[in-house]
Amino acid sequence: MKIGLIGLGKMGINIGKQFIDRNHQVVGYDVNQAAVDELKAYGAEGTTNLKEFISLLHPPRILWVMVPHGIVDAVLRDVSPLLSKGDMIIEAGNSHYKESIRRYNQMKEAGIHYLDAGTSGGMEGARHGACFMVGGDHEAWEIVEPLFRDTAVENGYLYAGEAGSGHFLKMIHNGIEYGMMAAIGEGFEVLENSQFDFDYEKVARVWNHGSVIRSWLMGLTERAFAKDAKLDQIKGIMHSSGEGKWTVETALDLQTATPVIAMSLMMRYRSLTDDTFTGKVVAALRNEFGGHATEKK
């Protein structure tokens, strides 16, 4: 397939390289010339000019949009007038599911297919095999299922159903992630405050071999402690990107109790003023899987 890729940030540049590895043709677009040049050097076409970008694709076009949720509407406003009926937009960032439903309806009126694709696995997943949760019309899904099959890990993609369902699943996934990361951080803070002198890298390693709590997150915990044995180089500030808040808000709307997720969100807010070891662990984990910045001491 020939894919038009909009957004060549940490996730977009890596998914673009994986598309090429899987023998798909890629045309990249970003306002950052250096990012465009990097993808072109890997074998893609690319430009910083949106009209030129669209001209390098032929109907029916497939656009993969991977930009921060706050600029999706601006991207759609600029690109949709350049598209033709039957073209497709796959929005693979972290948008609120209600916004995805609204955008689906807008694009449907213009005759453009619109899929909302929740993407998990961080930068490594984007580069080597991700997890996808996709919502939208089944007719559109059938066209691009091979693309998701090629770029997902084995059994790592799901057609979730109607518009919005893909990003709804990703939202809840991220809420669960908040709770899991908080529990890992709290556990290591208890270790830090105990009378024992533990090697946290070794602790994370042994817990990740055969224990009930083994996981990719525990593996990333080991990796973080390998780089900084006591996380002395970073502050315990845990930033949040919105999905945990959306999960809690949705749970309140549905009158569904989510105390673990809600408290993990509250602790992230608290970390903006109080430096804790839990915060250091969570901040380090976010940096490991998503390249999210930590605040240095």
UniProtKB/Swiss-Prot annotation:
Record EC number: 1.1.1.-
Record-level Gene Ontology MF annotations: NADP binding; phosphogluconate dehydrogenase (decarboxylating) activity
Sequence positions that bind NAD(+): 7-12, 94
Record bears the keyword Oxidoreductase: yes
InterPro entries in the record: 6-PGluconate_DH-like_C_sf (IPR008927), 6DGDH_YqeC (IPR004849), 6PGD_dom2 (IPR013328), 6PGDH_C (IPR006114), 6PGDH_NADP-bd (IPR006115), 6PGdom_BS (IPR006184), NAD(P)-bd_dom_sf (IPR036291), Pgluconate_DH (IPR006183)
Keywords, sorted A to Z: Gluconate utilization, NAD, Oxidoreductase
Active site: residue positions: 170, 177
GO biological process: one example: organic acid catabolic process
Disulfide topology: none
Keyword Secreted: no
UniProt: substrate binding residues: 94, 120-122, 173-174, 178, 268
Origin superkingdom: Bacteria
Family recorded in the similarity comment: Belongs to the 6-phosphogluconate dehydrogenase family.
Physiological role: May act as NAD-dependent 6-P-gluconate dehydrogenase.
Name of this chain's protein: Putative 6-phosphogluconate dehydrogenase YqeC
Organism (species): Bacillus subtilis (strain 168)
Gene that encodes the chain: yqeC
